[in-house]
């Protein structure tokens, strides 16, 4: 291929053209035969393959009566189908509502209700469960089995809707740390800016290979990684589900140069016995939440990874902080991505700036119009609560050093992070409170075994009626009906009384300090 061929999306510097539909059509027109996605244990797609298949899906949706502005909810784990429905929804100007396929019960019901979609497109393996949930609760929603939806016809490219910079094109649900999970409404510019952050801060080019093993129903997998590849011509290597045992082999086999990982993945990799093949790969960039100093050192020295880039962000605010190439992270988040964002540490009660070196709340706002969420779907009160005094309040505690580096300290909100997922303590508690003999519940994080980088385990303290004899296995099984697999507690504790504030709020900080006590029951089935 001619060395002068330009693979980077031509309008990357012009926000007016930050639209997924336009990106796909331009890239498929200029580079139709470039192999852009490889599904491990599956097919390989060119830009043209991607476009044609997405236009076929768009025709299916059009035949079902979808029109610009409608919401379409998908409950799909298969990355091939997920990607095609995502692009098809962009082609028609729809609002793509992506649900985490691990959720179930009341949490799933809440998310389907709030999305206000006429149809939920469900992967075959989940169809019976979701269909039953919808019918049982008399929702005015139709569930469609994705396996039964096919079309040889496609809409014409002239029918593709590009939309505007400000159009909401995606909804992803994030943990409701003090209430139900919230649907983050994401405009075109916000989605594309995730990808631009990766391109600019990772120096991503067409000759690179990006390994994606994180779920596409999160912004990390779909926008930071996949969309960044689509905009640059870098090849996306997709494993449908993370496999700890296959991670290193995949990195070597597919000549991976870039990847994003979670803390738990990093902890697994560095815990493997040293091997003479540890540097036998082409991996040059790892993007991750800040790693402790020792795992980062091991990646750099033992595995020879040139850049281990820390970053800080969330679905609502994009990635406003990146580590710098050729710089040791040392557990820090990096510096502000000043081209597009402002970040300050402020007093969480007074909303005023505080001095460098002091702990306060991390607050963010965009410089790029619509480079942020537009709000929480159906929850205007929550939008106002987090976005006040012209700053988004992340609920995270942090420090800004005089050098301009930011340090993440802890979560102000009662959010638990496990297996790469943010878990709402509220939703875990509600799953137990539905059990008739449970009177009070408090879910909180306990450090996982394995040291730094292993994230959290879920612990739930419970109060029960005095005359009840507890069988912990039955208790877990009852709660599981309304819990995602990653939300199932490892530890349960029955208490006679909770520590509480004067206003009656459970003091979870005291429960966390007590940790795993002698009267704690451990779930050995997770």
Predicted regions located by residue number:
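Conserved pre-ATP/AMP-binding loop-to-beta segment of ANL
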Residues: 32-33, 155-173, 180, 203-209
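AMP-binding/adenylate-forming catalytic core of the ANL superfamily
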Residues: 103, 110, 120, 364-369, ...
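Conserved AMP-binding/adenylation subdomain of ANL enzymes
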Residues: 93, 192-209, 217-257, 272
């Amino acid at each position: 291929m001619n060395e002068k061929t330009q693979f980077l999306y031509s309008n990357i510097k012009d926000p007016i053209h930050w639209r997924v539909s336009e990106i796909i059509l331009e890239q498929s027109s200029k580079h139709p035969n470039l192999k852009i996605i490889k599904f491990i244990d599956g097919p390989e797609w060119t830009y043209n393959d991607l476009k044609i298949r997405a236009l076929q899906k768009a025709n299916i949706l059009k035949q079902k009566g979808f029109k610009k502005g409608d919401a379409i909810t998908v409950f799909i784990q298969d990355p091939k189908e997920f990607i095609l429905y995502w692009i098809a929804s962009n082609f028609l100007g729809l609002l793509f509502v992506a649900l985490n396929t691990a959720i179930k019960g009341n949490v799933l019901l809440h998310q389907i209700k709030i999305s206000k979609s006429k149809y939920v497109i469900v992967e075959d393996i989940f169809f019976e469960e979701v269909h039953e949930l919808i019918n049982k609760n008399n929702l005015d929603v139709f569930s469609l089995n994705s396996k039964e939806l096919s079309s040889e016809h496609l809409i014409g490219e002239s029918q593709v809707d590009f939309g505007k910079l400000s159009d909401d094109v995606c909804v992803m649900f994030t943990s409701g740390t003090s209430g139900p999970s919230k649907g983050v409404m994401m405009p075109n510019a916000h989605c594309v800016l995730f990808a631009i952050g990766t391109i600019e801060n990772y120096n991503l080019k067409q000759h690179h290979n990006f390994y994606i093993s994180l779920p596409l129903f999160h912004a990390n997998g779909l926008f930071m990684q996949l969309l960044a590849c689509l905009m640059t011509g870098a090849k996306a290597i997709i494993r449908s589900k993370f496999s700890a045992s296959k991670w290193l082999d995949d990195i070597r086999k597919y000549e991976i140069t870039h990847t994003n990982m979670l803390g738990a993945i990093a902890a697994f990799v560095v815990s493997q016995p040293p091997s003479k093949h540890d540097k036998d790969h082409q991996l040059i960039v790892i993007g991750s939440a800040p790693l402790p100093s020792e795992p980062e050192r091991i990646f750099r020295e033992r595995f020879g990874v040139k850049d281990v880039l820390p970053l800080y962000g969330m679905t609502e605010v994009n990635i406003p902080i990146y580590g710098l190439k050729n710089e040791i992270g040392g557990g820090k988040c990096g510096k502000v991505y000043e081209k597009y964002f402002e970040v300050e540490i402020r007093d969480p009660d007074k909303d005023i700036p505080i001095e460098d070196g002091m702990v306060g709340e991390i607050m963010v706002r965009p410089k790029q119009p619509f480079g942020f969420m537009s709000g929480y779907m159906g929850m205007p009160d929550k939008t106002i609560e987090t976005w006040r005094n012209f700053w988004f309040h992340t609920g995270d505690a942090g420090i800004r050093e005089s050098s301009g580096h930011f340090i993440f300290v802890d979560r102000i909100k009662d959010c638990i992070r496990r297996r790469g997922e943010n878990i709402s303590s509220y939703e875990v508690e509600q799953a137990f409170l539905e059990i008739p003999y449970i009177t009070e519940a408090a879910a909180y994080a306990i450090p996982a075994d394995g040291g730094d980088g292993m994230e959290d385990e879920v612990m739930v303290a419970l109060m029960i009626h005095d005359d009840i004899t507890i069988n912990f296995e039955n208790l877990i099984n009852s709660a599981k009906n309304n819990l995602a697999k990653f939300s199932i507690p490892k530890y349960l504790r029955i208490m006679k009384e909770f520590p509480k504030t004067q206003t009656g709020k459970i003091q979870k900080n005291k429960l966390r300090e007590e940790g795993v006590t002698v009267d704690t029951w451990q779930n050995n089935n997770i």
